[in-house]
Each structure stands twice: as structure tokens, then as C-alpha cells.
């Protein structure tokens, strides 16, 4: 099979497209003929050798796929060859075949195409559990979303609205803010032209945001500390800016706030029940029409380097997806 292969730690330019052996079947597994694979910021960290779970070289990146089941392990129920599925895996998704645990695979709902399905699990799963299980977002609260037109940011806007929050979206261009508005944001802040703290306080009658969703880090995190309400919660999703901020403990004390770490992938180990329950909820919301997944760019498998460079260059909104032609 063809696969994108990482043989040396580094950036996207280190990747090659080669013939590779198919992954062995695992207990409780599904073999999937991959039609599409989601591209995530974590993939860039993984190929640099900086991800928390460092795979052995060589490997294929890619932690979410969509395609058709071609084989099931003995004893697997609920799936059969030919089923259209999407799945969360550790890595190995940038390939023509992948093996996933059946418990972390889901039937693709009617009306959802393979490209959309490939980009659904990570971004929607992240935002849903971050806002519900970790941050405890309540109806009537104010949610501030940084990077609101990006992959996870856009889903946080949608889910925040579904949960009954007032959503303030930040982004760096008017066009990106317009996309956040299309997905339900109540208020928009152009951080390249406006002071985030000043605008948040204006929009909340001086109170600040109850929950702040931050996949950006750097200057966005600094703005969060200045924009948070008393007793508020900042949830750390990632560091798309490339800068990992330091947390001044004195501000946490004085403002009576919490800074919460979040790692969606670790729910597979520690709370798989929450992860699978969350995905069922999200699929129900999708069926209702409450979620509108956005894939702004697609690339062929052989163009994986270009896809990752587009992600790192912040050229996309919503998701980037690779397609295999299968």
C-alpha cells in the first residue's frame, strides 16, 4: 500500500510517500481501506518528535481516518466488511489502509461524505469534552474562543452555542471572523486590530468571560488572563502560535481562576466511556443539523507535505483533509 512515511524527526519536508507494509490486525480491531485522513496540528508535533506519545521510526502520521471496513478481528461485533466508518487511531492514518480499535470507530451517518467524516472525530470530540467534562460550561455563561475559525476553534463556537453559551470569537482577519459568525458566534473580535481585553469587558459589562477556550497559546493566553471573569476557567487546548506560555500563579490566586489542561486522546486510556458517549452525542447533534463541519482544503495523499505546511501557515479554516482516491 502507499503511505506517507516519517523516517527522520523534523518538519513536513522530511516526509516521503512510499510503498509500506500493511499494519497487522489487532485484537478487537478493524482494517479500513482509507478514503480520507484528517490533518491535525498534533501530526506536525508528532513528526518533529515532540508529541507526548512518540512512535518508533519509521511511521506514518495521521490520527483519524474514514473509509470502508475490509476486515474485522475475530469477535468484533457491530461492523462488517463494506461498512462506511470513521475512526480515531494513534498514528498511521496517512496511508491507503489503517487498523483501528472497533470501540473507537463509528458508522458514518447518512448524508456525511468520507472527507467530512475524516475530519470529524478529533476537532468535535476535543471541543465537546473540553467544554462539558473539563470546563463545565453552563447555559448563560460567556465563552471566549481563540482561533475561532480554525479546526478546533470553529467546533468550539458551534458546541458553545449548542450548550447555551454566549460565544465571543477571536481571529486575525475579517474573513476568518465572518466564518466564525456563520457558525454561530455572537460577537467578533479582530485581535490584529482590537484589544481583546477591552472588547471582552465591553461585551460582558465589565465582568469578563466565564470560560476561555485557547488552542493558540502565546499572546492569546496572555489576553485570556486579562479577560477572564472572577472564578472563570481557561482551558488549554494547544499552542498553534508555537509559544508555550508560562502561568503566573499569583494571577490565579487574585482572580480566583482555574487554568485547565486538556488532552482528548488520553480519554481513550482513562475514560473511554466518556469518549464514546461524547461521540454518540455529537453524531446525534449532526443528525439534528446543529453541527456544520467545514473542510476548507483537501490534498491528495502524495501532497501531505503541502497539507501540513498549509496548516502550519494558518492558510486554512476548519479542517484540512488528505484523500487517497479509494
Predicted regions, residues:
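Mid-domain Rossmann-like dinucleotide-binding core that forms the NAD(H)/NADP(H) cofactor-binding site
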Residues: 118-194
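Glycine-rich phosphate-binding loop and adjacent beta-alpha segment
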Residues: 171, 219-291, 316, 323-326
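Short glycine-centered segments of the SAM/dcSAM-binding site in methyltransferase folds
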Residues: 84, 142, 166, 232-233, ...
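Short, glycine/polar-rich helix-capping loops at beta-to-alpha or helix-loop-helix junctions
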Residues: 93-96, 171-179, 244-249
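Short amphipathic alpha-helix with an adjacent loop that forms part of the alpha/beta core around
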Residues: 196-206
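Glycine-rich beta-strand-centered segment in the early N-terminal region that forms part
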Residues: 22-39, 50-92
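NAD(P)H dinucleotide-binding glycine-rich loop of Rossmann-like/cofactor-binding domains
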Residues: 33, 45, 56, 84-147, ...
Amino acid at each position: 500500500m502507499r503511505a506517507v512515511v516519517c523516517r527522520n524527526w523534523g518538519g513536513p519536508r522530511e516526509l516521503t510517500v512510499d510503498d509500506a507494509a500493511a499494519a497487522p490486525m489487532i485484537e478487537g480491531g478493524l482494517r479500513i481501506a482509507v478514503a480520507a485522513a484528517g490533518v491535525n496540528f498534533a501530526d506536525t508535533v508528532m513528526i518533529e518528535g515532540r508529541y507526548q506519545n512518540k512512535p518508533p521510526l519509521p511511521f506514518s502520521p495521521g490520527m483519524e481516518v474514514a473509509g470502508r471496513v475490509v476486515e474485522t478481528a475475530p469477535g468484533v461485533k457491530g461492523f462488517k466488511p463494506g461498512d462506511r466508518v470513521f475512526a480515531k487511531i494513534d498514528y498511521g492514518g496517512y496511508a491507503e489502509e489503517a487498523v483501528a480499535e472497533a470501540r473507537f470507530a463509528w458508522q458514518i451517518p447518512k448524508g456525511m461524505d468520507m472527507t467530512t467524516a475524516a475530519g470529524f472525530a478529533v476537532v468535535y470530540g476535543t471541543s465537546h469534552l473540553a467544554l462539558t467534562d473539563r470546563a463545565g460550561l453552563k447555559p448563560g455563561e460567556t465563552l471566549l474562543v481563540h482561533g475561532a475559525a480554525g479546526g478546533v476553534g470553529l467546533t468550539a463556537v458551534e458546541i458553545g452555542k449548542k450548550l447555551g453559551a454566549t460565544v465571543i470569537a477571536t481571529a486575525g482577519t475579517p474573513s476568518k471572523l465572518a466564518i466564525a459568525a456563520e457558525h454561530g458566534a455572537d460577537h467578533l473580535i479582530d485581535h490584529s486590530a482590537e484589544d481583546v481585553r477591552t472588547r471582552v469587558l465591553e461585551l460582558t459589562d465589565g465582568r469578563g468571560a466565564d470560560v476561555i477556550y485557547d488552542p493558540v497559546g502565546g499572546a492569546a493566553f496572555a489576553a485570556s488572563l486579562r479577560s477572564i471573569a472572577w472564578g472563570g476557567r481557561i482551558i488549554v487546548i494547544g499552542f498553534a502560535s508555537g509559544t508555550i506560555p508560562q502561568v503566573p500563579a499569583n494571577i490565579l490566586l487574585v482572580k480566583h481562576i482555574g487554568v485547565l489542561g486538556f488532552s482528548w486522546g488520553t480519554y481513550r486510556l482513562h475514560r473511554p466511556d466518556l469518549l464514546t458517549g461524547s461521540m454518540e452525542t455529537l453524531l446525534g447533534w449532526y443528525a439534528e443539523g446543529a453541527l456544520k463541519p467545514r473542510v476548507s482544503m483537501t490534498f491528495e495523499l502524495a501532497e501531505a507535505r503541502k497539507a501540513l505546511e498549509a496548516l502550519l501557515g494558518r492558510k486554512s479554516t476548519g479542517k484540512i483533509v488528505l484523500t487517497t482516491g479509494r
